[in-house]
Amino acid sequence: DANTVEAARNFIAEWKNVVKRDLNHPSIVTWTPFNEEFWPDEREYPRFITDIYTLTKEIDPTRPINTVSGGQHIVTDIWTEHHYEQDAEKLRQILFEKTEGSKDADIFTRKHDVQSRLRGNVGYNRPVLNDSYEFPIYKSEIPYILDEFGGIKCIEANPIKDRNLSWGYGNSAVTKEDFYKRLESQVRMLIENSKTIWGFCYTQLTDVELEQNGIYYYD
């Protein structure tokens, strides 16, 4: 829980050792301490994420930091989002189409579910919210990357309908040709909008445990 002091204390100690241990490894391009933190509070979470960013930069100033991949960013060198809409046109609208009353698309201005804390002030007879934090939204000065998209469910034979045993995103592609067609439409859409987006990462080419969303089988 990134909203607790105890979690922050333990993670900071471990993360410091991780960065120092792997500092010179050539395969590391970007530090990504967190993934999909969607439920931040307004006090401990911003402090914790900022501390991790600062600590990582102090140890290794040479690499960019994607502080919270696909989640609620506070301070970061790369702004990242995750979205698994399967229809390429709908995905384009979500990522790039300006919304009414805004100069940006929804995904640039959205905020995740903030967890407010009710605290009692001394001498006050009822709980009041005394934590207030203005979460940042994307600004074009830093790279914007869709670092998770796709996840196309692909089962060519004997599809399993029980999501506890097998799952992926969207309706299953029943042949490799169906899979490639859907994948191509998504990738082409992103390339056509390359002036806005800096990069993207397809998830994923191989099956993982119960996820059947790759073109390479788990075995």
Report the location of each language-model feature.
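Substrate-binding clefts and catalytic carboxylate motifs of secreted carbohydrate-active enzymes
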Residues: 27-31, 54, 87, 96-219
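Active-site mouth of glycoside hydrolases
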Residues: 1-90, 99-107, 136-141
